[in-house]
Amino acid sequence: KGEHVAIMGDNGAGKSTFVRQITAVEKRTGGKVWFNGRYVEFDGPLAAREAGIETVFQTLALADHLDVPDNLFLGREKIRFNLGPFSILDYKGMREATLAGLRKTGVKIPNISNTIQHMSGGQRQCVAIARTATFHSKLTIMDEPTAALGVQETAQVENIIRTLKEQGEPLILISHNMRQVMDLCDRIVVWRRGRICANLRKEETDGQDVVAYITGAKTQEQYAGAA
């Protein structure tokens, strides 16, 4: 708990597939998933989300025509009361929860009533990340969260990740950015050809060593089958 773990590997190594399988976006063909101390079998992404796993994918699942609260609560809206077959939404409650989530992560959105289509790439990414705080996730997974962002927007997202670390929020970060990984994570798991080939503590390795595992020049003894 509270650990930030990076997953690294070359293109096609299996990083994103791993994430899609533990969140039940794809069905596994083998293996088991242990989450929060117990074996789990999610029947779909909604079940994984309800268990407390929030995922920020490379392609953000945001609705351009909706504002920030509506995006955060899309598919899990707060209900004030039901009126026959109709539900009356608690817009005030959703707005307050959105502001609380933004404060918790340090996300700065000038006007949460703006629709997503009028926001920068960095602001969009921050909105996606803020969902993890709004719904008190037990695990946050970020798949290349800064891949398409500029320098300033990348710094903003990285500051949010640091805030999550300070608050003891566990994180899995998929990234090709060595500087980012060494700066933000406690442990680095390297994938190659669909298998783990190294599990490294940050303080016991360096960028050159990690690259050697990624390229196949090295493989940890316990993962010799991945060579």
Model-inferred region functions:
Residues 1-227:
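Glycine-rich phosphate-binding loops of nucleotide-dependent enzymes
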